[in-house]
Every structure is written in C-alpha cells, then in structure tokens.
Amino acid sequence: MLKFFLGLFFFIVYLLHPPLGFAFDKSDPSVSLLQNRISNNFTRNYCKDINNGFSKDEAMKSAIVKTENIISFSYNPQKKWIEKDDLANQISLQVVNDCGWSFGLIGKEGVDYFKSYFLEIYEKTTPDKNFSR
C-alpha cells in the first residue's frame, strides 16, 4: 500500500511540475533548399576549376565570386536566414566528397581543413559581403 501512495505522490508531482524540454529551432525548408542550391553551385564551380588546372586559391576565389554574384541578384528573402558557418560546413562536406580526393582532402580532417580554408579566403575575397545577406 505504501508503494502505491508513494507512486501516486510522484505521479502527481510529475504532472504538476513536468520536466523542462528544450526545443530546437525548426528549419524552414526554403532556407535549406536555398542553402543546398548555393552549396551545389559553389561545389560545381570549384571542382570544375580544380579539374581545369586552376590552383586551389584561384579556384576558391573564382567559385566564391561566381556564387556571390548569383546570390547578390537573388530576390529570395530567405537568404538572410542562412548561417555562414552552416553553409561553410555544407560546402566543405560537398567539396571533399565530390572532388577532395583529387587534391588530398579526405574524411573529417579534410572537411575541417577545407572549412577553415574556405572561411579564410572568403573573408579576404569579399570582406564587405556575406553569402547570406
């Protein structure tokens, strides 16, 4: 009988004071689609330039400028919600998976290296711009 009342007591306390839950921001599908488009465009340009014999720096700058030009003229209002770090992650994963082997980038180390390299060159190439703004 004691177990029953003790169980009932804890059940009532649980109902009166439920545990806190932490919710994540729900991602807007149109933001994800735009981010995918940007990432695909950058990766396609970068890998094409690498395969055409450009240096890493030349290919990076060229792909950034081409992608930035497309984004600048985009009227999609969702572009302001794209996080630069998320986009850099996605681009890094895609580049390493698509053509990273051709210049020695493989696995997580390759993705991390390319991400930091991308962000560094991006800041130098477009200091007053932001992919997503």
What are these regions (language model features)?
Residues 1-4:
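Positively charged n-region of N-terminal signal peptides that target proteins for export
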Residues 6-15:
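Hydrophobic helical h-region of N-terminal Sec-dependent signal peptides
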Residues 9-10, 42, 122:
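Enrichment for repetitive, rod-forming helical segments
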Residues 21-57:
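Immediate post-signal-peptide N-terminus of mature secreted/exported proteins
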Residues 62-133:
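Compact alpha-helical subdomains of small soluble proteins
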